[in-house]
Amino acid sequence: MSTPHKRGFNTEAFVIWGIIALILVAGIIFYSGYAVGAALTGQSITAWNPVAAMIGVIRGTAPWSMASTVVSIVVAVLLLGGAVGLWWRKLATSTPSTRVDKAGSMMGSGADIAFMREKAALNDARRLGVDSPGLPIAKTLSGQMLYSGWENVCVDIWGPRTGKTTSRAIPGILAAPGAVLVTSNKRDVVDATRGVREQVGDVWIFDPQAVAAHPATWWWNPLSYVTDEVKAQNLAEHFASGSREEGARTDAFFDSAAKDLLAAFLLAAAKDGQPITRVYRWLTRETDDEAVGILKDAGYPQIAQNVDGIISAPDKQRGGVFGVARQMANCLTSAAVLKWVTPPEEGEVREEFNARDFVRGRNTLFLLSKEGAGTAGPLVTALTVAVVEAAEELAVALGGRLRLPMVAMLDEAANVCRWRELPNLYSHYGSRGIVICTILQSWSQGVVVWGREGMRKLWSAANIKVYGGGVSETEFLGELSQLIGDYVYSNVSVSSSRQSGSSRSVDNDRKDKILDVSDLAALPRGRAVVFASGAPATMVQTIPWYTGPDAAAVKASLAKYDPAQQLANGGA
């Protein structure tokens, strides 16, 4: 028979320390009565040693009066009241325990995570000129709030219906001191935070697929981003990445040539002051060489020559390149989408969005799109990149970093914001005061967008990584289990025989996983694991917005903008 004992839960040690504590408390009660009682009755204290005093009282050689008894009772009541008060406070500030909380006691705590607690985080923020501690992460199991600082970037992996929006996205948006950019495929995050954010700055909602049923009251010109051939290539990459179906087969030649062709047409339209609709027009007229002349006149002869070569290619080859390019730019065929990226018609009033102006204030931009066929994801990605790069330009102009950090909450990043270069740029943005939080539903989602090595690079570049449960990918969970580490326990074996009687042996070198794959796959709702640079993995309790300090403000925003709540309240 063998019984494992985790060293963090040594029963014998608990009993020993409990006895010591009881002796100390009894000593305090006794000596308080002895010393104070003697002072009140004018008697002299015959012993300063509590043990000697107790022996004296028992033998009758040391004074003990009615006053001593009363004082001892009062001290006992005060100590009991204090203990009850501390217990009640802990009970009031803690959530019900779960099956993984015992494992949490063997993970990061105390000095290991002190830099994420409010006091240390606030001191670090003030060094950067910011008066708030950072993005809220969660609370420790003992109830202390943890924050991600204003130089950190985050990656979160939460499975479906695990509370990522209520516990991470919304609290992070509300905590932002400067501009905010949010991507999503649902309207809930907009309804919950719009009313709060509009009190500090302008709110822009980009909703070309009517996710939140928001009308096109403004527009953005994607070609305003295209200032040279490099930016044109970047924009073409966003179209290519955002339009490609998961698992779709690609041809290296046609894909590359189509992307170059699309980039050339984007550059030509931008340099000629044309709307983005002209790009798709050129893609449907395979022998139209208007763009070739524009590129030559704009000083891009090599790019013009490349376009001319594609136009002059054999019909099948030319058709293949143009066909792939049209597929990449497919979102430009939607009239609803084009309303958001083309100038207003005569008599129509729609303000033009300017990324450089946006990042200078405490403004908010919500970027909404659906995934799948007809997605506006390429434009969501393009506008996201335009805003982040505008923030970077401002940071450089200000000496290296933004005075008020900008928060980019990339919720559903793998579905609606497929920014291929993000892993290569991630760690750089934190130093600029651009705080990016990429939220995924699984590790494999990231692999689809960035590839296996790209996803590893993104994960490694993040200062704060949060796993919120709900994932069943054993390889990923196995790596998390290894990062969390092992606990050491003693194995007690008792054997018996008629000849020698019973014998007891202890093996103190046993190890096991603190949380194994099955534990992580079944992580209870309300619990998450935080991996912070320089600290052990930490078990935390998630804090939904409705239990936080901004609950009333969020409820007011929902009452104003959430159609379901408006109907429930008797509205239209």
Please state what every model-predicted region is.
Residues 1-162, 166-169, 497, 570-572:
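Basic- and hydrophobic-enriched, low-structure N-terminal and domain-boundary segments
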Residues 13, 44, 60, 83-84, ...:
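Acidic, low-complexity intrinsically disordered regions
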Residues 19, 50, 66, 89-90, ...:
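Intrinsic disorder/low-complexity segments enriched in polar/charged and small flexible residues
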Residues 426-529:
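Conserved ATP-driven motor cores of ASCE-family P-loop NTPases powering translocation/secretion/packaging/pilus
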Residues 25-38, 141, 145, 150-434, ...:
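P-loop NTPase motor domains
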Residues 49, 138-139, 273, 442, ...:
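Glycine-centered flexibility motif
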